Every structure is written in structure tokens, then in C-alpha cells.
């Protein structure tokens, strides 16, 4: 009996052994692993994954591999190797893994965030870039849209003067409406049931992504009931139902002479493809309603929670450092004053503010670990071979917290992005990729940077954001999902006296 069991275990171990394509090649050093379960028993059970993987670099080096179940994953934690993956060999590593959770979220590899490399992903990414180009100039200029929503946000917060509030909901409304103007050329009013629906499904998706879904590591388990997958399906169905209603209205009212939103542009591309007006490269199957909904869903998923979260991180760090907040406000007062509101042209003058935003993106990156990439061909990273189909994860936390690249990396020091005189922004290290890079870089980076600057500048010009009367400071620990979220906290809103006096003068 024992002999038979031993034989079966050996047979399983042999069957699931790593298949090395090039026996003579040098592969990254690997964590220990067992048949079927891979390296899971050898991974730390407590703490944030990005921190744990960073700590493993002390033993295994800046590039190492592990097995998630039977699948090999390479972890990259040095900027030179990361840039090789993302830029130099960006096309070779531009694939995406196919796992159950993300397949549901992307409606089976549709959209621009989680779709594998191929014609659909290339086409939709190209169209999204074209859509952002609609907002370069004129009345639809991106800056005007952001300033409009920021103004409404400030007006809303002014009604809360002297009160202690959670910024999450008002920020979510403002950031969501920026995305709505881009995608639909419309916006939501405070209290709209659709907005609450959107906020709830966003929260549900992030909660699902936060959990370690065993089915993503062991796909065979898909045949069994799974609460996480069911929750993801439920949230995605709600999202698609909401977006489908908007989509249908846009199709009914579509006017090819008035392309004012991303959805208009996608509908136009579909009509052109259906009419064979754009050549053989645009197959109408790639522009099905499901493909379009997935792309719009990705823009919302990537554009709303990310910016909302980073603004809250900025406020949290300023609450911990009131002297820095005061210096930024003095900078705004001197360079902008109160007779007008901040614009993007002020970025060259509000250097401490810009440095603070950059430092927040360093110390609390939007995604501590980038969405996994996949090797499309047999390739290499540095001196190490990487086989076709291998998953590759860039540990952004490791890049941004490398002691050899950053002085006291765990300290919040915006001044590191300024020269000694404080009169010029600098790049203190090449180990800084807050929005990724290469073919899979964040497609909304320009939008995000503009939002972060304008939201923060307007808020600090108009308000004193203060610690509540109970003295409760926000936790800076956070918890990573697809986005590095900050735990909810409250802030006391006070309209600045100087702003109030300036407005009173202007009205007389």
C-alpha cells in the first residue's frame, strides 16, 4: 500500500515538474516548490505581498522565479530589468495571463486592461488614444473638464464648512464625472442612483480582486462553486447593465458629424468597419457591443478609483505633515493668489506641490505590483532566460523603495524631487515608474497627472484640511487590491479666511 502511494506521489511530481525548454540556459533563481501547489507553502503568510516579495530579493536577488501552482512566474524588482521588460522588450512581454477572475472582469479577454496581446487589444488601445486626442483643445479641453468638476467639488465641500467628513464620496463623484465627460459627454448629479450603483460595483470588484482567489492558481477548481467568482460576475453584470443603457442611447442619437466622446468614437469605428470603410485591419467582430462595453468599463475601472485613492493619499500625508501643507498653501498664495483659480500652466510655479504629488506616487504607488505581463516568445531578462508563456510581475514597490536608489525610501520627503534651492524639479532616480512604461503603460497617465495637480491645488487654495477634533490621524498602512487603497479616514473642512475675504472683495 505504502509503495503504491509513494509511486503515485513520484509520478505526480514527475508529471508536474517544471518543463525547461532550453536545458543549457540560465534561468532566474527559484523559490522552493512542491508538486501541484508550487511555491505557495514557502511564501510569507502575513503582510502585504509587494513588501514580502521585496524582502525575498535579499535572498534571491532582483529577479527570481516562483511557481504559482504549476505556473512559473518571474518577479522583477530592479528598474533596469523592469525597463527591459516594459520598454526594450515591451512587445515580447506585452501579453496578459488568462486567469478566471480577470477573464470575468474582461468578459473573456476584451477591453484594454486585461486582454491578452492581439488584434482586439491593439485596435481598442489605438481607439482609446484617439478618443483622448478629442480633448486636447477647445471647449472639450481636458483641463476645462477637470476644472469644472473641481469647482463643483469645492462648492460642495464649502457647504460642509467646519464639519468633519470622509472625502471618499465627493471625490468619487468629481473623478467619476471627469471620466463620464470623456466617455459619454455627460455627468451625474449628487445623489443620482446610478452613481451609487457605480460606486457599489467598483467596491465589489476591488474587494474580489483583494482576495487570493485559489481558482486563479488552480484553474481546475472552476468546476466547483466559488463565492468570489460569483461576486465578480454579479458586479460585472451590474456594470454592463448600467453601461449598456448609456450605450444604447448613444447609438440611437449618434451623429457622425458630432463626435464628442469616447463612446461616439467607438460607435463610429464600428459603423465604419461594418461599412468596410476602414480597410481589412478593422474586423467588425473586434468592435462588437461586448468589446466596446469592456473597453469603456476598463476606462472607468482604471480612471476612477486610482485618482480618487491617490488624492486621498495626498491629503493623508499632508495631515501628517501640517508644515508641508502650510508651505504648499504659501506657494499657491504667492504664485496664484485668490483672484483666479489654479491652472495647468501653474505647474511650473507650484513646484513644491508637484514634488509632493510625485513623492506620494513613489511612496504609495497606485499599483504596488503592476498587472502581470506574459512572455509571448522565448526571451530573456538580463542574463536570464524566460520561456514563452511565463508570467512576469514588476514589483513597483521594490523599485520605489530601493535604498540604493532612494535616500531613506520609507520617509515621506517631497524635497527629494527638488534641487537644493527648491527652484527646479529634478528626477532623483531612474527607479521611478508610477504609471508603468512601454506598450502596456497606463493609457490615462496624462489625465491622471492633470487631475492630481488641479484637484490638490484647488483644494489647498480654498480650504484648510485639518485633523478632526478627536486628533485621529489617517493610517498610512493602506491595503493593496488592484489599486493601493488607503483606509477610510475623516478630515475637518474649513474654508480659508484669505479665500473668504478675497471673494467678499470681489463681490463688492
UniProtKB/Swiss-Prot annotation:
Heme binds at residue 442. Regulated predominantly by intracellular cAMP levels. The 17,20-lyase activity is stimulated by cytochrome b5, which acts as an allosteric effector increasing the Vmax of the lyase activity. SUPFAM superfamilies: Cytochrome P450. It catalyses: a C21-steroid + reduced [NADPH--hemoprotein reductase] + O2 = a 17alpha-hydroxy-C21-steroid + oxidized [NADPH--hemoprotein reductase] + H2O + H(+); progesterone + reduced [NADPH--hemoprotein reductase] + O2 = 17alpha-hydroxyprogesterone + oxidized [NADPH--hemoprotein reductase] + H2O + H(+); pregnenolone + reduced [NADPH--hemoprotein reductase] + O2 = 17alpha-hydroxypregnenolone + oxidized [NADPH--hemoprotein reductase] + H2O + H(+); 17alpha-hydroxyprogesterone + reduced [NADPH--hemoprotein reductase] + O2 = androst-4-ene-3,17-dione + acetate + oxidized [NADPH--hemoprotein reductase] + H2O + 2 H(+). It is an enzyme of class 1 (oxidoreductase). Its cofactor is heme. Its EC number is 1.14.14.19, 1.14.14.32. GO terms for molecular function: heme binding; iron ion binding; lyase activity; steroid 17-alpha-monooxygenase activity. InterPro entries: Cyt_P450 (IPR001128), Cyt_P450_CS (IPR017972), Cyt_P450_E_grp-I (IPR002401), Cyt_P450_sf (IPR036396). Keywords: Endoplasmic reticulum, Heme, Iron, Lipid metabolism, Lyase, Membrane, Metal-binding, Microsome, Monooxygenase, Oxidoreductase, Steroidogenesis. The keyword Amino-acid biosynthesis does not apply. Pathway: Steroid hormone biosynthesis; Steroid biosynthesis; glucocorticoid biosynthesis. Its main location: endoplasmic reticulum. It is found in: Endoplasmic reticulum membrane; Microsome membrane. One of its GO terms (biological process) is hormone biosynthetic process. It comes from the Eukaryota. Pfam families: p450. One of its GO terms (cellular component) is endoplasmic reticulum membrane. Belongs to the cytochrome P450 family. A cytochrome P450 monooxygenase involved in corticoid and androgen biosynthesis. Catalyzes 17-alpha hydroxylation of C21 steroids, which is common for both pathways. A second oxidative step, required only for androgen synthesis, involves an acyl-carbon cleavage. The 17-alpha hydroxy intermediates, as part of adrenal glucocorticoids biosynthesis pathway, are precursors of cortisol. This is Steroid 17-alpha-hydroxylase/17,20 lyase. It comes from Equus caballus. The gene is CYP17A1.
Amino acid at each position: 500500500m505504502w509503495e503504491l502511494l509513494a509511486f503515485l506521489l513520484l509520478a505526480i511530481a514527475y508529471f508536474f515538474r517544471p518543463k525547461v525548454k532550453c536545458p543549457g540556459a540560465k534561468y532566474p533563481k527559484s523559490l522552493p516548490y512542491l508538486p501541484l501547489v508550487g511555491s505557495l507553502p514557502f511564501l510569507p503568510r502575513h503582510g502585504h505581498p509587494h513588501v514580502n516579495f521585496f524582502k525575498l530579493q535579499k535572498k534571491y536577488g532582483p529577479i527570481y522565479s516562483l511557481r504559482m501552482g504549476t505556473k512559473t512566474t518571474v518577479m522583477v524588482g530592479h528598474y533596469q530589468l523592469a525597463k527591459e521588460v516594459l520598454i526594450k522588450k515591451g512587445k515580447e512581454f506585452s501579453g496578459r495571463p488568462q486567469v478566471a477572475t480577470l477573464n470575468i472582469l474582461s468578459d473573456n479577454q476584451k477591453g484594454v486592461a486585461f486582454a491578452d496581446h492581439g488584434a482586439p487589444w491593439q485596435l481598442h488601445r489605438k481607439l482609446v488614444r484617439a478618443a483622448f486626442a478629442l480633448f486636447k483643445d477647445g471647449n472639450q479641453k481636458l483641463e476645462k473638464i477637470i476644472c469644472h468638476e473641481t469647482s463643483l467639488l469645492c462648492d460642495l465641500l464649502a457647504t460642509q464648512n467646519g464639519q468633519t467628513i470622509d472625502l471618499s464620496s465627493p471625490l468619487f463623484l468629481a473623478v467619476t464625472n471627469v471620466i463620464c465627460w470623456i466617455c459619454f459627454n455627460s455627468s451625474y448629479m449628487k445623489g443620482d442612483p446610478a452613481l451609487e450603483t457605480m460606486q457599489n460595483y467598483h467596491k465589489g470588484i476591488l474587494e474580489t480582486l483583494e482576495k487570493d482567489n485559489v481558482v486563479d492558481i488552480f484553474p481546475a477548481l472552476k468546476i466547483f462553486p466559488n463565492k468570489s467568482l460569483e461576486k465578480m460576475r454579479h458586479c460585472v453584470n451590474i456594470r454592463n447593465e448600467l453601461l449598456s443603457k448609456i450605450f444604447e442611447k448613444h447609438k440611437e442619437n449618434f451623429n457622425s458629424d458630432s463626435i464628442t466622446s469616447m463612446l461616439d468614437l467607438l460607435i463610429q469605428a464600428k459603423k465604419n468597419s461594418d461599412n468596410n470603410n476602414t480597410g481589412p485591419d478593422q474586423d467588425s467582430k473586434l468592435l462588437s457591443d461586448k468589446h466596446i462595453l469592456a473597453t469603456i468599463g476598463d476606462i472607468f475601472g482604471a480612471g476612477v478609483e486610482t485618482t480618487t485613492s491617490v488624492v486621498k493619499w495626498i491629503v493623508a500625508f499632508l495631515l501628517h505633515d501640517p508644515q508641508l501643507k502650510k508651505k504648499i498653501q504659501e506657494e499657491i498664495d504667492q504664485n496664484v493668489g485668490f483672484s483666479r483659480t489654479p491652472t495647468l500652466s501653474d505647474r511650473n510655479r507650484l513646484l513644491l506641490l508637484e514634488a509632493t504629488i510625485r513623492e506620494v506616487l513613489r511612496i504609495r504607488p497606485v499599483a504596488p505590483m503592476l498587472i502581470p505581463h506574459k512572455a509571448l516568445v522565448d526571451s530573456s531578462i538580463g542574463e536570464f532566460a524566460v520561456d514563452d508563456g511565463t508570467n512576469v510581475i514588476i514589483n513597483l514597490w521594490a523599485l520605489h523603495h530601493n535604498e540604493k536608489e532612494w535616500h531613506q525610501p520609507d520617509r515621506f520627503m517631497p524635497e527629494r524631487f527638488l534641487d537644493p534651492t527648491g527652484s527646479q524639479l529634478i528626477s532623483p532616480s531612474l527607479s521611478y515608474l508610477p504609471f508603468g512604461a512601454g506598450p502596456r503603460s497606463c493609457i490615462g497617465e496624462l489625465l491622471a497627472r492633470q487631475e492630481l495637480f488641479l484637484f490638490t491645488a484647488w483644494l489647498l487654495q480654498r480650504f484648510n484640511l485639518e485633523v478632526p477634533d478627536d486628533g485621529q490621524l489617517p493610517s498610512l498602512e493602506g491595503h493593496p487590491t488592484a489599486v493601493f487603497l488607503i483606509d477610510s479616514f475623516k478630515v475637518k473642512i474649513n474654508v480659508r479666511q484669505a479665500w473668504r475675504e478675497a471673494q467678499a472683495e470681489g463681490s463688492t
